[in-house]
Amino acid sequence: MSSNKINKKSIARIAAVQAIYQNILQNNDDMDDIMQNVLSFYQNNNSTTALPENLKISLSISHFKMLVKSVFENINKLDEIIDNHLTNDKDPAHMPILLRALLRVSICELLFCPTTPAKVVINEYTDIANDMLNEHEIGFVNSILDKIAQENNKIS
């Protein structure tokens, strides 16, 4: 049997969204505590209980920590960017928590991680959104990331 592996950075992105979701949901600003909770979940293999036996999951700890720290350092700017891209009929206070968490992490990686190409960021987070959000929200994630990438000359 061949062993399947999921990209370590992809898992780190999912874990970062989970950490930021936990931050919002629990109103917990202790970044180290949040990171430790999420890391222990993955390191104790709790994430693999519902997966096929031959599927191996591990995350890039450095990428995970970099994403979470960058979100915490830039949270006000990220929220301002998100809120500025909402249409007039959308109230930022009513944005679903998971959607806001995913947007914070994805926009953070898009703007503050120059080593990751914009198209990779857009594709990765659209895929993550596809697994976590409804159809309308998936389209919104794709659209907002594309607009932000264009506005910041990340793609043409």
UniProtKB/Swiss-Prot annotation:
The keyword RNA-binding applies. One of its GO terms (molecular function) is RNA binding. Signal peptide: none annotated. It comes from the Bacteria. GO terms for cellular component: cytosol. One of its GO terms (biological process) is DNA-templated transcription termination. Disulfide bonds: none annotated. InterPro entries: NusB-like_sf, NusB_fam, NusB_RsmB_TIM44. Keywords: RNA-binding, Transcription, Transcription antitermination, Transcription regulation. CDD domains: Terminator_NusB. PANTHER family: ANTITERMINATION NUSB DOMAIN-CONTAINING PROTEIN (PTHR11078:SF3), N UTILIZATION SUBSTANCE PROTEIN B-RELATED (PTHR11078). Involved in transcription antitermination. Required for transcription of ribosomal RNA (rRNA) genes. Binds specifically to the boxA antiterminator sequence of the ribosomal RNA (rrn) operons. Belongs to the NusB family. This is Transcription antitermination protein NusB. It comes from Rickettsia felis (strain ATCC VR-1525 / URRWXCal2). The gene is nusB.
